Amino acid sequence: MSAQTSLAAQPASPVLPNIPVRPPTTTPPPVPAPTAAPDLPRLYGPPGWTVRIGLWRLLEPWLDTPRCLPGESPLRLDARGAPVSDYVPFRGMDAATAADLLNRLPAAALSDRQNLAPSLKAMLTACAGADGQVRLCGYGIGPQREDERLSAEALWVADADLQGYEVLVEHSRDCQCSALWERVRDRYGLDAGCIPDDIVRTRPEWAGGAVGWWMWWD
């Protein structure tokens, strides 16, 4: 067979349609640039709200920490102005500080309470209006935690007419703890859910050694 005959016997190549190559008509959506997480509200406000209202400087004189050298402060703050520790206990808060906090704290934060203790607002109000006869103890929780807040867990009451009550360790029938608590509760408008878990007569250093009743809720 000749070369000419061999070429003629081969099938012809198919003719492809003339379809132009075009880019796709749709494009994938743009990938959003990463953004910082928003300051979502926590228990009583956005992260750092205690720093913004100046809470930690107000607590500084009342921090429950070891003694410092002259010129030193027991309060350790980071670059944001937040305490280095997320738990900051205080004791002996006076009337002036309590009144200042009533004006600075958000309304929601004033509703805080330590379990069945009086609300923070009731405790601060009692302290602010007692001219030194009522002091507060508690703690602050820093911005490191979701439950950033101020809590009052105890009050110290030094009213002279309340010092004659007898409170016994075993709380026997002769113990007057319930009668004492009712007097304190009614006098200062304390909205506690129950009697304090502990009532002790004390002479704290932060009260200049004056005698008073320390009432604490677990």
Model regions and ranges:
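Long, contiguous N-terminal structural blocks used for assembly/anchoring
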Residues: 2-173
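Intrinsically disordered, low-complexity regions enriched in Ser/Pro/Gly/Gln/His and often acidic
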Residues: 42, 55, 174, 199, ...
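Short, aromatic/basic amphipathic alpha-helical patches
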Residues: 168-184
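Acidic, proline/glycine-rich low-complexity IDRs
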Residues: 179, 183-218
